[in-house]
Amino acid sequence: MSLEQVVVLLVAAAGAGWVDAVVGGGGLLQLPALMVAGIPPVQAMATNKLSSVFGTTTAAITYVRSTKLDRQVAIPAGALAVLSSGLGATAAVAISAEVLRPVVMVVLLGVAAFVTLRPAMGQVPKPHLRTNARVVAAVAVGGVGIAFYDGIMGPGTGTFLIIAFTTILGLDFVNASATAKIINIGTNVGALVVFGLQGHVLWTLGLGMAVCNIAGARLGARMALKRGASFVRVVLLIVVAAMVTRLAWQQFA
């Protein structure tokens, strides 16, 4: 691998850390960069998980120090996410990405329309929506459903978690993003363990990228905390549009 390719990967890792810390979707930058460098898809996914687990943990710590974390959801969902994502990573070899991409594209378009048509969504918390049944639903959706998807494919996991917690629990975007980071740690760890046992992780490269991912994540989390829910909403819509575009290109190009 050339020096230029290494520099591109490090820059992509920093950008991915920033995006992941704000709304998720950093894989949009990291995964293509890894594959353009000539790394096979499975190894690229595995190395992406290694880098991301450090950045996501950094973002989570930054959020926890400055905002309220929904521990009633984050802790059980995060624990379940380790198992669910691991199962997803195991199933990844049997499920074609071509089958999942159109479904994910439709869901992302629905998310974009939903957020666009509801400008007040996620701007302020709505605690009156919270019930025990909704807490259980949020844990199941985040810790099982979305986590399993992250193990199989991944794009949009953080975004899906934020939308789920905002819609189901009435959290604002900043608190939803903070809570999502804990589940994201679980999904990254679960998938990383499976990929590591299968020998797909490029450890030296992944750890080098992790340093830049940490820097980007720290900056992204601080910006989200400083600029608030409106900033997170704008970045979320931009990232969703970018994800739909990339998935469409992969599917139809």
Regions found by a protein language model. Give the residues of each.
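Selected transmembrane alpha-helices and immediately adjacent juxtamembrane segments
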Residues: 1-40, 126-177
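Residues within membrane-spanning alpha-helices of integral membrane proteins
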Residues: 6, 49, 104-108, 112, ...
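Residue-level signature of the transmembrane alpha-helical core
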Residues: 10, 14, 18, 49, ...
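Membrane-interface alpha-helices at helix entry/exit sites of multi-pass transporters
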Residues: 39-48, 72-76, 170-181
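Selective hydrophobic functional segments
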Residues: 46-106, 188-238
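Transmembrane helix exit motif
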Residues: 58-68, 89, 106-131, 242-253
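Hydrophobic alpha-helical transmembrane segments in multi-pass integral membrane proteins
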Residues: 87, 91, 143-153, 191-199, ...
